[in-house]
Structure formats: C-alpha cells, structure tokens
UniProtKB/Swiss-Prot annotation:
This is Ferric aerobactin reductase IutB. [2Fe-2S] cluster binds at residues 220-221, 232, 235. Optimum pH is 8.5 with Fe(3+)-nitrilotriacetic acid (NTA) as electron acceptor. The keyword Metal-binding applies. InterPro entries: FCR-like, FhuF_C. One of its GO terms (biological process) is cellular response to iron ion starvation.
C-alpha cells in the first residue's frame, strides 16, 4: 500500500471512530506558538499550561488533581487512538513521535504528520515500535509540563496503561468475534512495548458468556469532582468495582 493510500485509510477510519479525531498531512505552522500547535521538535510548555489553565477556569471546583489528570489525558488520547487504528485497521504505523496536535481551550482535537511515510510489519512488530514511539512522545509531554508543575512518572504510567486498555476495550467492540485470549495477549504485548508493569493486566476482564472485554481502571480521572458529574462506569472508585 502506498503512503498516500495508507493515510487515506487512517484518516477515514479515524473519523468513523470519532469526528474529533481528524487527521491531515501538511507542513507544520511556521510559528507553532501562534497556532496552538504542539510537536516534539518545538517547545510546547506554554500551550500545555494554557490548556491546564482553561480547565481550571472552566471547573474551579474540581481542583488541581483533576486539572492535571485531564490535561495529561487530553495530550495522550489522539496518539493512542491513532496507534490502534493504524495497526488494527490499516496494518501499518506512522511515526507517532512526530505527530503534531492542535490545542484548543479545554480540549485537544486534530492531528497531522509532515509526510506520508509509514512502517509496515506484523502486529507484534508494529506494537513494539508503537510502544517506543509513544514512550518518546509522552516523555516529551512530561518534560514540558515539569517546567511548571510536578508530574510523577508513576502517575502517568497508570494513565498510560488505562489509555491502552481503554483502546483495547473499544477494539473488542469493533471485532466481537475475536477471542478473549487474543485480547489478553494483545494487552501483554502493549504493556511490554510501553514499558508498563505486566501486573496491570489484572485491570482487564473477559466474560466468555457475553464475549465482552471490560476494564476497571487503576487510575481515576476525577471528573466526578466537576459540578454535576458522576463516577465513570470503569472507575476504581465506583461501588460496582470495589474488590472484596
């Protein structure tokens, strides 16, 4: 498949997953600082802090832990989704670490690449490479944020793993005929590739009767601290998810 065809498929599948995930191939803005654009080759600390401050302004009652958690989750959701869509729907992988993203008040939506280069390989090979690329990109986010706040690697690791598992659950909904063993093996591959503790796989459950994969997160997004919001269904704080 040509690079052009691969990215056409990637962008089309992205839009089917969610209209907020719109991609493009185009040059980076000449002045990234003026366009709310974050990229690993540019300083993005101010853009990320502006995102944090917009969340603080919108939800002052939620507190600093929520603003930080939400900021991190917003930075990471598109690269994770693109990795999964590329590997499982398009059988390839773009250079995730060079993915640019567009930051708006309280949200991150829209991504782009400079060119149509992509990698081909087996699922296992692509997952291994995706893990390296995501680790590099997320390390960059953490370094940029550490210029103005404290953000621990242990904190981001749990959010990273929950993000990966959340994508696996969505994948299982798109491909309900695949077995539970398949999804659990994929989870192990992703954890190894992303240098995440294998014990976190205990967050996943597969019900043979309903053929459904489910997740109880190890991290809490803290959205319940926002006025009018409740605990998420996969939250570890939810009463239904309390372990006896």
């Amino acid at each position: 498949m040509s690079g052009h065809s691969f990215f056409e498929h990637l962008f089309e599948h992205s839009q089917h997953v969610t209209p907020y995930l719109h991609g493009a191939i185009k040059p980076r803005p000449e002045r990234c600082a003026e366009h709310g654009f974050i990229h690993i080759e540019h300083a993005s600390s101010d853009h990320i802090r502006a995102l944090y401050e917009s969340l603080k302004l919108a939800h002052p009652e939620a507190g600093a832990a929520y603003w930080l958690t939400r900021t991190w989750t917003l930075l990471c959701w598109q690269p994770l989704y693109v990795a999964f869509i590329a590997i499982y729907s398009c059988q390839g992988l773009p250079k995730l670490s060079s993915m640019g993203q567009h930051v708006q008040p309280r949200f991150v939506s829209g991504y782009q690449f400079d060119d149509d280069e992509y990698r081909q390989g087996s699922e296992q090979e692509l997952i291994a490479h995706a893990g390296k690329e995501l680790c590099a990109l997320f390390d960059y986010f953490r370094q940029e944020m550490s210029l103005w706040t404290r953000i621990r690697p242990g904190f981001t690791q749990h959010l990273f793993a929950d993000g990966v598992f959340g994508c696996l659950v969505k994948l299982s909904q798109f491909y309900p005929t695949l077995s539970g063993d398949y999804f659990l093996e994929q989870a192990r591959l992703w954890l190894a590739a992303c240098q995440l503790p294998e014990k976190l796989i205990q967050s996943l459950r597969y019900d043979e009767t309903s053929r459904q994969l489910s997740l109880v997160r190890t991290s809490c997004c803290l959205v319940y601290k926002c006025q009018g919001r409740e605990l998420c269904r996969d939250c570890p704080r939810h009463p239904d998810n309390k372990r006896e």
